[in-house]
């Protein structure tokens, strides 16, 4: 009896060891999947990442800016018609100035499109500028259009602001992505550090990858949409057809971009509203996709846009945005009645202190 008891006791450790072995193998398999997914994610978005230095004001004040110069995210020789994209314009003399995040629950990211006329036209002006303000605390998303004709003083810091008013959309032309972000932060007292950049072709390509987006086109917009579409065909050789009538319809990428760029019909304010509508429709379309479709979209869109966010940042921001889609607001600055107009050249003149207070109250609350 004693031997039998000893034998039974002796088998227990082997059973535990076997169970532990299964658990270790299961854990290893899960870790392998996680690591594999992370490597896949990094592989996909490695081509979108552009390293743009972020420096504090003390380091900026001691920089040697005599060399100047400019650079892009990479090769600019591939034409739009051959699938090329206009690369990010970055001037080493204008790094992004480090700004402390005001609220750890609220992140502000600049999404902008450039008015380039070819892949070598990288030192161009911005066509649209939108701030995605993501509030993790209350799961809300605010999409804020900054009017491109707003008159501002351009510069990296309060001490280096220019003395002559320029349109906000020219900041990118004069000093690349760094000076554009710095100007917005200084003028409006914001804390933007991250950005996403598109050109006409890349925005259209992403919309096409999603199967187009549903837009309610007003009858009076049809001819203007087709005019912009004709211009885009001349620039990049796309074969997107004209639309024939107004109403709710699915627009392909080039049609949607052409619709969002209509300006001569009404105003720049209506134009900014159309751009926000396209952005929201695209985010909603992606959010409604299955997990497999989202992975395929990520794979297909690699290299279509450029950003200074790494793969982990992109994943975090995307998840936060999707979580906030049902609680979103759209707005533009400056607001109606808070600016005057200068006709030659046409610019929107603002009270800087008033607008600074308004946009801060809107993002962070009064």
Regions from the language model: what does each represent?
Residues 2-10, 14-29, 37-366:
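Non-catalytic, solvent-exposed segments at the cell envelope interface
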């Amino acid at each position: 009896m004693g031997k039998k008891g000893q034998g039974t006791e002796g088998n227990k450790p082997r059973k535990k060891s076997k169970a532990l072995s299964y658990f270790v193998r299961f854990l290893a398999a899960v870790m392998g999947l996680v690591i594999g997914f992370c490597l896949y994610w990094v592989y996909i978005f490695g081509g979108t990442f552009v390293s743009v230095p972020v420096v504090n004001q003390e380091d900026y004040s001691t920089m040697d800016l005599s060399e100047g110069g400019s650079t892009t995210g990479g090769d600019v020789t591939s034409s739009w018609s051959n699938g090329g994209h206009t690369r990010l314009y970055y001037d080493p003399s204008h790094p992004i100035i480090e700004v402390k995040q005001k609220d750890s629950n609220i992140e502000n990211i600049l999404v902008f499109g450039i008015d380039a006329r070819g892949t070598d036209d990288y030192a161009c002006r911005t066509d649209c500028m939108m701030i995605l303000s993501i509030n993790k605390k209350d799961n809300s998303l605010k999409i804020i259009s900054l009017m491109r004709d707003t008159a501002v003083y351009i510069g990296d810091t309060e001490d280096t602001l220019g003395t002559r008013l320029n349109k906000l959309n020219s900041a990118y032309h004069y000093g690349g992505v760094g000076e554009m972000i710095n100007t917005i932060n200084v003028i409006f007292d914001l804390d933007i550090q991250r950005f996403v950049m598109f050109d006409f072709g890349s925005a259209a390509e992403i919309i096409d990858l999603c199967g187009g987006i549903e837009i309610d086109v007003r009858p009076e917009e049809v001819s203007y949409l087709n005019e912009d579409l004709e211009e885009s065909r001349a620039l990049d050789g796309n074969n997107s057809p004209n639309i024939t009538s107004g109403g709710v319809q699915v627009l392909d990428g080039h049609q949607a971009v052409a619709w969002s760029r209509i300006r001569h019909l009404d105003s720049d304010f209506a134009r900014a509203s159309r751009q926000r509508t396209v952005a929201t429709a695209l985010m909603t379309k992606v959010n409604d996709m299955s997990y497999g479709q989202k992975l395929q979209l990520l794979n297909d869109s690699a290299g279509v846009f450029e950003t200074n966010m790494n793969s982990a940042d992109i994943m975090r921001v995307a998840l936060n945005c999707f979580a906030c889609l049902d609680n979103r607001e759209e707005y533009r600055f400056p607001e109606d009645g808070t600016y005057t107009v200068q006709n030659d050249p046409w610019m929107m003149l603002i009270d800087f202190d008033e607008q600074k207070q308004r946009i801060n109250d809107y993002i962070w609350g009064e």
